A protein has these predicted regions:
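Structural motif
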Residues: 22-24, 51-53, 82
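Short glycine-/polar-rich loops that comprise or flank the Walker A/P-loop
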Residues: 46-49, 77
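A contiguous pocket-lining binding segment that forms or flanks enzyme active sites
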Residues: 49-55, 59
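C-terminal lobe/tail of nucleotide-utilizing enzymes
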Residues: 68-128
């Protein structure tokens, strides 16, 4: 499905041409791109720093912590976590997930609702 020679060439081109390049994780670090080659392998191959992006709400702790655990096990550079989407203010998990993730992982966590702007001065870790 994927032409990995073209993908390799495109990655090398963009990573060398631009100071800042964003690579979308296409659904998670364990999404297979081909047999026995996952998004996590692509991260390793190009030594990409990672920002874990997760939704607010129930289930986020589990998949975010598993993702961070896998990245740490693979010795990947994790810049932080962004929780994004709709904030249901009546959901206790929405109120507590960011602080729990920060406490357990030691990573910076940014909560970003729909159409909210990011203060890059307060969140410099995003553009390292």
């Amino acid at each position: 499905i994927f032409d990995f020679k073209k993908i390799d060439g495109a990655f090398k081109y963009f990573l060398n041409k631009y100071k800042f390049t964003v690579v979308e994780g296409v659904g998670g670090i364990l999404v297979p791109l081909k047999q026995n080659f996952f998004v996590s392998d692509l991260i390793k191959k190009f030594n990409l720093p990672v920002i874990v992006v997760a939704r607010f709400g129930l289930g986020t702790l589990n998949h975010t912590l598993l993702t961070v655990e896998k990245l740490k096990r693979d010795r990947q550079k994790i810049l932080g976590v962004i929780l994004s989407g709709k904030k249901n203010k009546n959901d206790i998990s929405v109120k507590s997930n960011a602080s729990i993730i920060k406490k357990i992982t030691g990573l910076p966590v940014l909560e970003l609702g729909y159409n909210e702007k990011v203060d890059l001065e307060k969140n410099r870790w995003i553009i390292k």
